[in-house]
């Protein structure tokens, strides 16, 4: 999976500098891996393992809910995540969400997919200078429409055998010449994106 390569490359960077990564794989076959509750819980557990301060924030949430006898609601989980992300010693934080399209979608009623897309928007709206969010998904119309309003950039990969070099050239040109990316992303971030996507371009 392309997200696995992205995560692997980010982890390599985290080993050499002040950065953190948290990731989540949605799964249409597992209800526990759909919607925002599992996502938020997983992101918190990964990020709170990084420092005592972030762990203390999580413990505070745990204490408020009778030391685990009650389940925090999704709003409480999100507010706790915001507090953790505000800790400066995390450095740059990469959040990777894979296969958003595997959240079910039923038109006309609230769905896990809509909740996830709203959460992504709220994370982007934090405008945190050290947060980088990567979302992968099939290009389904509702997801495209939601993410287009929040994404600083998107890369679409569709290839047949033999087109890998063309895709790599396309990725490199987008990352290197897009003015918005040039202004917002550091050189090492741009290189990380190119390397990660290029390694998995074949057959996408």
Give names to the regions the model predicted.
Residues 1-204:
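Conserved NB-ARC/NACHT P-loop NTPase core of NLR-like innate immune receptors
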């Amino acid at each position: 999976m392309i997200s696995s390569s992205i995560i692997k490359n980010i982890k390599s960077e985290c080993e050499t500098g002040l950065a953190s990564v948290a990731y989540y794989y949605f799964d249409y076959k597992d209800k526990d891996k759909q919607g925002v509750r599992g996502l938020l819980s997983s992101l918190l557990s990964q990020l709170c393992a990084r420092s005592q301060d972030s762990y203390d924030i999580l413990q505070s949430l745990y204490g408020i809910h009778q030391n685990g006898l009650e389940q925090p609601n999704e709003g409480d989980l999100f507010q706790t995540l915001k507090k953790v992300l505000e800790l400066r010693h995390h450095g740059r934080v990469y959040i990777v969400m894979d296969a958003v399209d595997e959240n079910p979608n039923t038109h006309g009623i609230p769905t896990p997919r809509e909740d996830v897309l709203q959460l992504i928007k709220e994370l982007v709206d934090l405008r945190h200078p050290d947060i980088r969010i990567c979302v992968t998904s099939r290009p389904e119309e509702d997801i495209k429409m939601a993410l287009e309003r929040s994404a600083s950039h998107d890369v679409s990969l569709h290839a047949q055998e033999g087109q890998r070099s063309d895709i790599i050239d396309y990725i490199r040109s987008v990352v290197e010449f897009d003015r918005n990316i040039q202004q917002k992303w550091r050189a090492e971030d741009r290189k990380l994106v190119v390397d990660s996507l290029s390694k998995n371009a074949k057959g996408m």
